[in-house]
Curated annotation (Swiss-Prot):
Disulfide bonds, paired cysteine numbers: none
Record protein name field: Large ribosomal subunit protein bL21
GO biological process, one term: translation
GO MF annotation: an example: rRNA binding
GO cellular component, one term: ribosome
Entry keyword Ribonucleoprotein: yes
Coiled coil: none
Length: 103
């Protein structure tokens, strides 16, 4: 059984036992969270699509770790004007382990 969930402004396809990295969630490591924004639930050929959410569907996950992604480097330049700007960014993430998909 799999589900399409929405968290942090993004959508993820998840199944029980998978680990995913999502936008940072304010939860402690080891804490179990319940995601109720489930857009679709499927099992084999059977698929339930919500309008926009599937009623009563939930996904339970455990927070495994918090961390930061690799640095993304931004470089802006205007040719012939000697304008160069360098910038970097590291996005925070939360790693979740999906325990159950209900729906």
């Amino acid at each position: 059984m799999y589900a399409l969930i929405k968290t942090g402004g993004k959508q993820y396809k998840v199944a029980a036992g998978e680990k995913i990295k999502v936008e940072q969630i304010a939860a402690d490591v080891g804490q179990e969270i319940v995601i109720d924004q489930v857009l679709a639930v499927g099992s084999g050929a059977d698929l339930k699509v919500g309008t926009p959410l599937v009623a009563g569907a939930t996904v339970k996950a455990t927070v495994v770790a918090h961390g930061r992604h690799d640095k993304v480097r931004i470089f802006k330049m205007r040719r012939r004007k000697h304008y160069q700007k360098r910038q970097g960014h590291r996005q925070n993430f939360t790693e979740l382990e999906i325990s159950t998909v209900n729906g």
